Amino acid sequence: DNGIVASASLVADDGASSTGGINTDTGNDVTTLTLGYNGDGWGGGLVLASNDGDVGTVGYDAFGLGLNYSPESIPATISVAYDTKDPEGTANDETDLFIGVDYEVGPGTLHAAWNTTEVDGGSDNLDISGFEVSYSYSINDGVTITPGFFTVDDGEGEEDTGVVVETAFSF
């Protein structure tokens, strides 16, 4: 469906506790606002989030922007997302960039994505990057299989690599 999509939420981490509460100075609260638009062949969204950090955790403000485009000339979707996180106090800011492509190949879709996170003010070993590749295809009307692999560089020269097989059922 095309059109505007929006949401707002308030999550109280300590809402179940009588000493924490909801939206109080004795509990942590996270407020999130989203606004997006879906059009023919494209879409985008904006996310604003804030953690007040009142108790035990560092508060932060976060901003995210994402766009996707599906050109009519090729069977693909290109997605780009940019996110920032600004913690209170002396904690280091984070910037994240994601680029993904979905391309119809044969009976399924090939997915490829790259992501990098840069931690400002910290050492380079806090920066991480990685990529993933997968292929999804339907086994029948209700089952989709998606095998894939990923690798993530932790910034210290170590890589975590894995193989994944997801099976999705629809009834």
Could you tell me what each predicted segment is?
Residues 1-171:
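Outer-membrane beta-barrel proteins
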